[in-house]
């Protein structure tokens, strides 16, 4: 499945992008919102939505306190989305996981490294830390500094079915295709890149079709 990343300034604009999109799921980046009025407009689409409110340190668009982010997470959980995504190193990770479990909403626990792709054992340590919180999906995203980084992060798929792992940057595009084939879902842009090297939904579908035809 392909997740289209929704970058919008409010719920109404997010709805417009979802309606015109061709993805299977949509990640709504709440850190891009300038206002949280009208969040209920997203409720009809909730079964196909992943809500995330990234902190500034995790690549979020703006600074927001943990308490503000937690309040917004609680509001979107009332819409019963498919998932909420919260950063492993966020100060509210455990609380968001707990709130989501009470609502029976899926949890994506994420880790982003915008500088490099750490060595494999450090990546494995991230996975182990995530597993302690028992998320439904573990998302590990790093920055590719070499083509070899694609293969290193792909090793995280060995023996795991709930991992989404890939590299950002132009050197990491191979890992995005690997992710599309091995992960429960992977991410693509609707109209503008949410991360360096991100493919569009159309580009990713085309690439998957080519690889599929070659089997």
UniProtKB/Swiss-Prot annotation:
It holds the Pfam family DHquinase_I. Belongs to the type-I 3-dehydroquinase family. The active site is at residues 112, 139. Homodimer. Its EC number is 4.2.1.10. It catalyses: 3-dehydroquinate = 3-dehydroshikimate + H2O. Keywords: Amino-acid biosynthesis, Aromatic amino acid biosynthesis, Lyase, Schiff base. This is 3-dehydroquinate dehydratase. The gene is aroD. GO terms for biological process: 3,4-dihydroxybenzoate biosynthetic process; amino acid biosynthetic process; aromatic amino acid family biosynthetic process; chorismate biosynthetic process. SUPFAM superfamilies: Aldolase (SSF51569). CDD domains: DHQase_I. 3-dehydroquinate binds at residues 27-29, 54, 176, 198. It comes from the Archaea.
């Amino acid at each position: 499945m392909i997740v289209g990343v929704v970058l919008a300034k409010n719920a109404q604009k997010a709805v417009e992008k979802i309606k015109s999109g061709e993805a299977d799921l949509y990640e709504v980046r709440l850190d891009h919102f300038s206002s949280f009025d009208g969040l209920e407009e997203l409720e009809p689409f909730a079964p196909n939505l992943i809500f995330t409110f990234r902190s500034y340190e995790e690549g979020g668009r703006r600074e927001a306190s943990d308490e503000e982010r937690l309040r917004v997470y609680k509001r979107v959980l009332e819409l019963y989305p498919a998932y909420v995504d919260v950063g492993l190193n966020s100060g509210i990770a455990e609380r968001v996981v707990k709130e989501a479990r009470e609502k029976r909403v899926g949890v994506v626990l994420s880790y982003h490294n915008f500088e490099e792709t750490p060595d494999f054992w450090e990546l494995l340590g991230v996975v182990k830390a995530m597993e302690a919180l028992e998320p439904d999906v573990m998302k590990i995203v790093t920055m590719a500094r070499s083509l070899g980084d694609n293969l290193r992060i792909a090793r995280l798929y060995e023996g795991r079915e709930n991992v989404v792992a890939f590299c950002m940057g132009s050197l990491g595009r191979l890992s995005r295709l690997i992710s599309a084939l091995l992960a429960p879902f992977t991410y693509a842009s609707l109209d503008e890149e949410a991360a360096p090297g991100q493919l569009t939904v159309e580009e990713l579908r085309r690439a998957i079709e080519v690889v599929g035809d070659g089997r």
